Amino acid sequence: MSSLSESAILVRDALVARGLETPMKENGVSREEKKERIEEHMREILTLLSLDLSDDSLEETPHRIAKMYVDEIFSGLDYANFPKITVIENKMNCDEMVRVNDITLTSTCEHHLVTIDGKATVAYIPRGKIIGLSKINRIVRFFAQRPQVQERMTQQILVALQTLLGSDDVAITMEATHYCVKSRGVMDATSSTTTTALGGIFKRNPATRHEFLSGIR
């Protein structure tokens, strides 16, 4: 098992303490073994669906799915993949809102394992620390790369940034299309879901909250 960074451990422990961690159980299975076993099971599933895996279009599909699950769309289940975080001292004494708009994200609904496609806007008020801007995007992506519900994902990003910045003054809003609604069930192709998580001054101060929410495109 890969050793975890200090940032990864801090964020994971903060989420566990708040009951916000994605339901997971460590099984001690290596990445490569996971791929092998997922490939075996996926081969069985596709065969049960009457697909001919000897066809040259399908023969590598179980392998591709296994690799995709472990290395890509579910890579956020492994905190060894938590992004390297750069946090610096706020020597400039910056005290105005920092906002990153329209962070694109693709996640997976944990109920049906189909796509969630959306964007997030993240803001914070610098106190003692400033975080590298690209790190905000990477944190959003990390939590998107696992089976999710949007409400929890929004809270996870909030708590992760609060933990790394040492400040409660963080805000997130997320708008996403859920393909479990769009491509099955009710088959609603136009609706989207918006979730918001506010901390510190964004929750306490109506003016700060309004500045954040009114600036969202």
From Swiss-Prot:
A single BP term in Gene Ontology: one-carbon metabolic process
Q: Does the keyword Nucleotide-binding apply?
A: yes
Q: Which GO terms describe its molecular function?
A: GTP binding; GTP cyclohydrolase I activity; zinc ion binding
**Which reaction does this enzyme catalyse, per its entry?**
GTP + H2O = 7,8-dihydroneopterin 3'-triphosphate + formate + H(+)
Pathway, according to UniProt? Cofactor biosynthesis; 7,8-dihydroneopterin triphosphate biosynthesis; 7,8-dihydroneopterin triphosphate from GTP: step 1/1
EC number per UniProt? 3.5.4.16
Superkingdom of origin: Bacteria
UniProt-listed Pfam families: GTP_cyclohydroI (PF01227)
| Any one of the GO CC terms | cytoplasm
* Alphabetically ordered keywords of this record: GTP-binding, Hydrolase, Metal-binding, Nucleotide-binding, One-carbon metabolism, Zinc
Residues binding Zn(2+) are 109, 112, 180
Q: Which family does it belong to?
A: Belongs to the GTP cyclohydrolase I family.
Q: How does it assemble?
A: Toroid-shaped homodecamer, composed of two pentamers of five dimers.
Q: Which named protein is this?
A: GTP cyclohydrolase 1
- The UniProt gene name for this protein comes to folE
